[in-house]
């Protein structure tokens, strides 16, 4: 393929890259608009110099040392929200990492690495804890931007832009449109999105469309936030969406409708945002507003996955991480409060056996059956267990056998996936024959926990003597 271009045209593109495929309309955008850096502040943030030492998933940390939503706790906390990249996701989310910034980062800043030098680069500290928008420097897919509230730090893998609200939301609308990906291709054909390239993007501020764009972006943020917080991997998770229904089948159908409505509305929003910016930039002959389903970055209901997440929530209630009486995260370190749990009382020993047969009344299957009974009532118990068993699809002749086999064979694998190989429930396992397994909750682990596990094994062995 050959291009015939006047070399002077490239002078209008910031940095003058030789983008031979750029149309006249696209090139004119650099003349008609301002560079992104002239309208907001794109910044590189904190490079700790030792990710393994100073960065955690939020659920690994005790709530005593976390400052997630409480600015008052800032002076006493160790771990703070940290924008550090993540998977392709638009509008809101990927909020799962925290960084050690105790005492304004003194430990990070003064840390000496293996080479005998200070490895940290705490850049642009004046912007720490401000609200803004972040993007992943490296993506396996397209470019995407997420809004975040006050209280976050940011990194070189999750760089950020800052501006007053109206400008910020307008720019985020542009960055999550098809146009941003097109213009980024002029500077960088790869999937590595650095601060310099983002800074060069042309922003045409249209008075005609600014209000509509801000409203669409704000609504997209709300939808994406609702989606993100519907799962226990979010620190703003309150309760499982299946809890407030008469039975599990109805609960899933209601959840499925909610997911579909969110998905359709977000797709509609994104296509309207594309339509707006295509019109502003005059690219009707080059781009269409349509968005493929695969590029809508929120969840669509999946019966098996959702039943497994319900089971995971039940296990959280068994350990006292969650409660049927009080919403949100109840215990992940700190002071234990019996008054928050009501009738479904967490396991007192913090040891829940998983066995291939019913050796203990309080093994994981027994506790799970009690949980389902507590949530939906005794009258519908068998129907609910059958619904769960059918969704799981494990081996077994009865609903209880199928659910037991799921706990025995697959629950922990799924837990490792959910918590990205940093489990909050730890597994004691006697080996490949599944003779004995037990779960303990890391935030309730004490020096006595292993002794209790051994005692339970002895009780099981006595039944065979």
Report each predicted region and the residues it spans.
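Polynucleotide-recognition surfaces of large bacterial nucleic-acid defense/processing enzymes
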Residues: 1-117, 121-132, 140, 214-362
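Terminal accessory regions of large proteins
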Residues: 265, 275-278, 282, 286-465
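Active-site donor-binding loop signature of nucleotide-sugar glycosyltransferases
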Residues: 85, 163, 203
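Amphipathic alpha-helical segments
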Residues: 171, 201-226, 252, 416, ...
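Short, well-structured alpha-helical interface segments that form or flank functional binding sites
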Residues: 78, 130, 156, 166, ...
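Serine-centered coil/turn micro-motif
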Residues: 177, 234-235, 246, 409, ...
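Basic, amphipathic alpha-helical recognition segments used for DNA target recognition
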Residues: 136-200, 208, 212-223
């Amino acid at each position: 393929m050959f291009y015939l271009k006047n070399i002077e045209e490239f002078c209008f593109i910031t940095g003058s890259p030789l983008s031979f495929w750029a149309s006249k309309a696209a090139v004119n955008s650099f003349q008609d608009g301002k560079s992104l850096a002239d309208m907001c502040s794109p910044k590189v943030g904190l490079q700790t110099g030792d990710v393994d030492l100073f960065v955690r998933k939020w659920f690994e940390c005790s709530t005593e040392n976390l400052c997630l939503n409480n600015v008052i706790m800032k002076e006493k906390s160790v771990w703070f929200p940290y924008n550090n990249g993540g998977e392709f996701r638009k509008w809101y989310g990927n909020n799962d990492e925290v960084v050690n910034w105790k005492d304004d980062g003194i430990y990070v800043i003064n840390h000496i690495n293996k080479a005998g030098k200070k490895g940290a680069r705490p850049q642009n500290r004046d912007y720490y804890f401000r609200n803004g928008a972040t993007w992943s420097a490296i993506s396996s897919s397209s470019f995407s931007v997420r809004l975040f509230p006050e209280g976050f730090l940011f990194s070189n893998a999750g760089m950020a832009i800052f501006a007053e609200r109206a400008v910020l939301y307008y720019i985020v609308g542009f960055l999550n449109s098809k146009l941003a990906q097109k213009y980024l291709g002029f500077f960088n054909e790869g999937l590595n999105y650095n601060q310099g390239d983002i800074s060069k993007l042309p922003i045409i501020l249209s008075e005609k469309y600014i209000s509509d764009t801000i409203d669409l972006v704000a609504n997209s943020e709300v939808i994406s936030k609702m989606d993100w917080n519907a799962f226990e991997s979010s620190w703003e998770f309150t309760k499982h969406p299946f809890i407030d229904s008469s039975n599990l089948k109805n609960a899933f159908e209601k959840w499925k409708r909610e997911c579909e409505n969110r998905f359709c509305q977000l797709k509609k929003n994104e296509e309207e945002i594309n339509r707006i910016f295509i019109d502003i930039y005059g690219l009707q002959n080059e781009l269409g507003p349509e968005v493929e389903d695969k590029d809508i970055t929120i969840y669509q209901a999946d019966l098996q996955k959702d039943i497994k997440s319900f089971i995971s929530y039940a296990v959280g209630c068994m350990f006292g991480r969650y409660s049927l009486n009080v919403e949100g995260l109840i215990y992940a370190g700190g002071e234990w409060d019996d008054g928050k749990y009501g009738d479904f009382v967490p396991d007192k020993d913090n040891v829940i056996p998983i066995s291939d047969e019913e050796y203990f009344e309080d093994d994981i299957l027994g506790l799970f059956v009690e949980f389902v009974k507590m949530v939906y009532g005794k009258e519908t118990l068998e129907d609910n267990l059958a619904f769960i068993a059918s969704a799981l699809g494990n081996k077994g002749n009865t609903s209880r056998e199928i659910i037991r086999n799921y706990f025995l064979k697959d629950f922990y694998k799924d837990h490792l996936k959910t918590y990205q190989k940093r489990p909050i429930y730890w597994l004691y396992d006697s080996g490949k024959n599944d003779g004995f397994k037990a779960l303990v909750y890391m935030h309730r682990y004490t020096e006595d926990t292993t002794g209790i596990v051994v005692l339970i094994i002895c009780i099981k062995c006595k039944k065979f003597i």
